[in-house]
């Protein structure tokens, strides 16, 4: 039996929704513990001081402070959270 697909049918026309990846908190921005700093696939950015990494390579703050991006050995980029010391005057 000869088979002929009906005309006008389209096999394409699908696309997946964007995954909303990227930097969520930029350098110098204040973060609190638990804030997501970067959503990524793989480790484009590596965790530095006071930054944790999730099973999906999401980087998040482990302490309150300011975000700092830096490049170290082998051209590897790191994200750290710099803790600001608060000097409270005792009255």
Curated annotation (Swiss-Prot):
Family annotation (SUPFAM superfamilies): Ribosomal L27 protein-like
Keyword terms: Ribonucleoprotein, Ribosomal protein
Any single GO BP term: translation
Stored Pfam families: Ribosomal_L27
Annotated region (Disordered), positions in chain: 1-22
GO cellular component terms, semicolon-separated: cytosolic large ribosomal subunit
GO molecular function annotations of the record: structural constituent of ribosome
Family according to the record: Belongs to the bacterial ribosomal protein bL27 family.
NCBIfam families to which the protein is assigned, alphabetical: L27
Protein name: Large ribosomal subunit protein bL27
Organism per entry: Methylocella silvestris (strain DSM 15510 / CIP 108128 / LMG 27833 / NCIMB 13906 / BL2)
